UniProtKB/Swiss-Prot annotation:
Protein's UniProt name: Nucleotide-binding protein MADE_1020535
Organism: Alteromonas mediterranea (strain DSM 17117 / CIP 110805 / LMG 28347 / Deep ecotype)
PANTHER family: UPF0234 PROTEIN YAJQ (PTHR30476:SF0)
Gene Ontology molecular function: any one: nucleotide binding
GO cellular component: cytosol
Family, as annotated: Belongs to the YajQ family.
Function of the protein: Nucleotide-binding protein.
Entry keywords, A to Z: Nucleotide-binding
Pfam families named in the record: DUF520
Keyword Nucleotide-binding part of the UniProt annotation: yes
Length: 160
């Protein structure tokens, strides 16, 4: 019986490369000369530090550009609100990995409401979709791709 898995994974090596590229761009930009600003990658999060709030916004834009150049979907970014420590502003960016329970239930409901002849099962942080026909599975993939659920999904282990 044909099946596939829906997962949400991020290549953290590419995130680290994007962080390095954004740091390099930060050091060469004229509007950041003489300003204490930096990107730090640690424990699957990126911490941005700057002297003003508008600089953090510019840095976030730079980081999003670097991520898209490295082919990492920016919808996986979870940007936390900034906090001020003295004259330094900090902002943390976390990344959504795995499909959380509420999102998984939304995907199951989406597929069931479309009346596609497939069965979906939640298996931890991924979903297994099984059906009799390959066309039904491809229709389920198209439904999930069209839905805007706030994070990127990959489709793996497509088996006939």
């Amino acid at each position: 019986m044909p099946s596939f898995d829906i997962v949400s994974e991020i290549n953290m090596e590419e995130v680290r490369n994007a962080t390095d590229n954004a740091s390099r761009e930060l050091s060469t930009r004229f509007d950041f000369r003489g300003i204490d600003a930096s990107f730090e990658y640690k424990d699957k999060t990126v911490v941005m530090k700057a002297e003003a709030e508008f600089q953090l916004q510019q840095m976030e834009s730079m980081f999003r550009t670097a991520m898209s150049k490295r082919n990492v979907d920016t919808s996986s970014m979870d940007v936390k609100p900034y906090d001020a420590h003295g004259k330094t502003y900090r902002q943390t960016i976390a990344f959504k990995e795995g499909i959380e329970q509420p999102t998984a239930k939304k995907i199951v409901k989406l597929i069931k409401d479309a009346k596609v002849k497939v069965q979906t099962a939640i298996q931890g942080e991924e979903l297994r979709v099984t059906g009799k026909k390959r066309d039904d599975l491809q229709q389920a993939i198209a439904l999930v791709k069209e839905a805007n659920l706030g994070q990127p999904f990959q489709f793996k282990n497509f088996r006939d």
